[in-house]
């Protein structure tokens, strides 16, 4: 996959992508990440990329022409078609199903806004989709772009050392439930013991426990996800057992 990022601070994206899963994906040739700065395509001695908004008001607005020229250069760098995605608090919420859709693309261009935003005419003419990473406002789109890069990169074949890691994540699978708890060594600690079932070697019992914990944790923390999940009789039985086994002080 190739991802081009248009940003006034492309080095920020490069630094975020230099480590962990995304860095490893680049080393393996599974991800090509390229930053583009609109200031490099601005005119005049000051290479201005923003100006005051019509109608007055605070802040500055990113100008059409530097962005248009920058986008043209980014698109020309690779012949494959690429949707242009603007990171915006007004966009479609980024979810795991949407991430899976985007991960199937061979290429995408991410646009990071700054100041009060981007001239609406550029958004109308050049942007295919707006995506939000949450109902809050950041100083710019770079953090959102870094999140999106990470989310879609880890879904690429060969990026994770164990493909099952992604399949068992929260929000994955047809039900989109939260993940179950995980434990490692030591088995006994002052802060608690590892559940006995995980040390039993009984794979059927372990699978049942993990499924029940996934259902129960979703019910406790994100109950609205269960409204959209299709649970069979076994799932409903496991969830009911989980509810009954809760200590009185832990009940919702």
From Swiss-Prot:
Q: Does the keyword Transcription regulation apply?
A: no
Q: Could you say which EC number(s) this protein's record lists?
A: 2.1.1.228
Q: Which GO terms describe its cellular component?
A: cytosol
Positions that bind S-adenosyl-L-methionine = 113, 133-138
**Subcellular location as annotated:** Cytoplasm
Quick check: keyword S-adenosyl-L-methionine in the entry?
yes
Catalytic reactions of this protein: guanosine(37) in tRNA + S-adenosyl-L-methionine = N(1)-methylguanosine(37) in tRNA + S-adenosyl-L-homocysteine + H(+)
This protein's UniProt keywords:
Cytoplasm, Methyltransferase, S-adenosyl-L-methionine, Transferase, tRNA processing
Q: Which terms does the UniProt entry file under GO BP? A: tRNA N1-guanine methylation
Any GO molecular function = tRNA (guanine(37)-N1)-methyltransferase activity
Q: Which InterPro entries match?
A: Alpha/beta_knot_MTases (IPR029028), tRNA_m1G_MeTrfase_C_sf (IPR023148), tRNA_m1G_MeTrfase_TrmD (IPR002649), tRNA_m1G_MTases_N (IPR029026), tRNA_MeTrfase_TRMD/TRM10 (IPR016009)
Family membership noted in the UniProt record: Belongs to the RNA methyltransferase TrmD family.
Q: Which NCBIfam families match?
A: PRK00026.1, trmD
Q: Which PANTHER family match?
A: TRNA (GUANINE-N(1)-)-METHYLTRANSFERASE (PTHR46417:SF1)
Summarizing the function annotation, the protein's role is: Specifically methylates guanosine-37 in various tRNAs.
Q: Quaternary arrangement and interactors, per the entry? A: Homodimer.
Q: What is the protein name for this chain?
A: tRNA (guanine-N(1)-)-methyltransferase
State the organism of origin. Answer: Xanthomonas campestris pv. campestris (strain B100)
Q: What is the lineage of its organism?
A: Bacteria, Pseudomonadati, Pseudomonadota, Gammaproteobacteria, Lysobacterales
**Gene name per UniProt:** trmD
